[in-house]
């Protein structure tokens, strides 16, 4: 019996003007996801996916490169304006926003959606180096 070959579908170009940039910036990495207004992903990138490893992954430069590559991929779908939501305490927050603006996307709003507990779970113990 002949095996079926897996054919990859060609990515369909959508024509989306406005979208949302979700920037998740942790102490170890920065992940940038560009979505339409409903939250369906158009493109994404991260510092780790670009080949930055170890402590270089958490730098503002790595976040800037991640935002640039995600923006270029999303602009192929016709993206022009963005609302930015930033989550997390990492170093790449501002760098990623600046990179999105420099790539030619118009940022209409910046929102901080970092989750803050109302005294929920006990945090991990402090590091002693």
From Swiss-Prot:
Pfam families for the chain: Ribosomal_S11
Domain of life: Bacteria
One GO cellular component, as annotated: ribonucleoprotein complex
Disulfide bonds: none
GO MF annotations in UniProt: rRNA binding; structural constituent of ribosome
GO biological process: translation
Gene3D superfamilies: Ribosomal protein S11 (3.30.420.80)
Cross-referenced InterPro entries: Ribosomal_uS11, Ribosomal_uS11_bac-type, Ribosomal_uS11_CS, Ribosomal_uS11_sf
Family: Belongs to the universal ribosomal protein uS11 family.
Function: Located on the platform of the 30S subunit, it bridges several disparate RNA helices of the 16S rRNA. Forms part of the Shine-Dalgarno cleft in the 70S ribosome.
Subunit structure, as described in the record: Part of the 30S ribosomal subunit. Interacts with proteins S7 and S18. Binds to IF-3.
UniProt name for this protein: Small ribosomal subunit protein uS11
Protein species of origin: Bacillus cereus (strain B4264)
Taxonomic lineage: Bacteria, Bacillati, Bacillota, Bacilli, Bacillales
Encoding gene per record: rpsK
């Amino acid at each position: 019996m002949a095996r079926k070959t897996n054919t990859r579908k060609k990515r369909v170009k959508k024509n989306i003007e406005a979208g949302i940039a979700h920037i998740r910036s942790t102490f170890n990495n920065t992940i940038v996801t560009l979505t339409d207004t409903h939250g369906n992903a158009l493109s994404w990138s991260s510092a780790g996916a670009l080949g930055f490893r170890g402590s270089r992954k958490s730098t503002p430069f790595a976040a800037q490169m991640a935002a640039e590559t995600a923006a270029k991929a999303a602009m192929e779908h016709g993206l022009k304006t963005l609302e930015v939501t930033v989550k997390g305490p990492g170093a790449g927050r501002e760098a990623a926003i600046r990179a999105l603006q420099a790539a030619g996307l118009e940022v209409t709003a910046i929102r901080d959606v970092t989750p803050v507990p109302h005294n929920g779970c006990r945090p991990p113990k402090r590091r002693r180096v």
